[in-house]
Amino acid sequence: MAKADEGTDYIRVTLARLVPEHGQGRVVILKTYKDPKSYYMDGATLVFNRPLGIRRNKVVLPAGYELVGCTVASQVLMEKDGRIAISFMHAGAGEAPLILRAVKDAQVGAAALPHAATRDKSWESPFAGETERARLTERAYEDRDIVYFLQQPETHSFSLYHDYTERRAGVNGYANVVRDGSVASHPSAYVLDTGAQLKATEMSGAEMAASKINTGETVDPKARVVVIPFTAVKEGETLRLRIAETYTAPISYKLDGDELVFDRTLGRPRNAVVLPSGWYVTASAEPATVSLLPDGRVRLEYWDDRPEAADVLLKAKRRVEK
């Protein structure tokens, strides 16, 4: 082969027919690699550490393994036989720096099989079209961080904290509208800069308007909203807040047979979802990076660089008890 590296082995394929002018020759290549440097066990953890130069990739884990680490944002999918797979498109230059980690405590056999996908649409209506100004806002500059901590699915509840920077002079409150189908409880807030605790109160949109608290936005009078007042922001200053709440949302977070289902649009660029203890991810419609927390829970990071909301559909199964 011209320009070939003499120290490298190649597979040479003879095509069944000549490639026509302006045409293509399609080839399916099936091969098995053995490479201890890129695919190995690190204690009880399976590691696949292999940069991938192909633009579209899918990696299927062995039966019985759950995904606990993935460095490239990927869809998490389930094969028909219950094996976990990741799939991603790599649009950047060079190779995708993929490192997968997995541990052997996933279900096997009939218990591992996925539920059949339905024709049901998302319970949430699509978001209204964004304005040109919103679409051209620099999303990498947005510094909101939201972490969802899923409780056991039988409760339909999840807690979250939301870090937010207020920069608008004259604003003296934050409003968090409670979505239809959700109930908010245990709201709290404090100033990250000073540690000062803030009062959080749930009220209607009409009550918020009557309170004269300036949150910088208008809320439907009938909506339920958690309002957090604070000292008005002065010109040239900012205020960094951490807001925490617990939501109960039977429509978006539930147990479907033996599967956990979290179905919720996330509108901010940076979101994370932490599975409850004892569960492993089996499906994630939105690409996510995956990591394992010190306490054994799985965390999925959704960094959404697109102007529309991330339509997260996340599924999980219980780990095998050891």
List where the protein language model places each region:
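Lumenal/extracellular ectodomains and adaptor appendage modules
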Residues: M1-K322
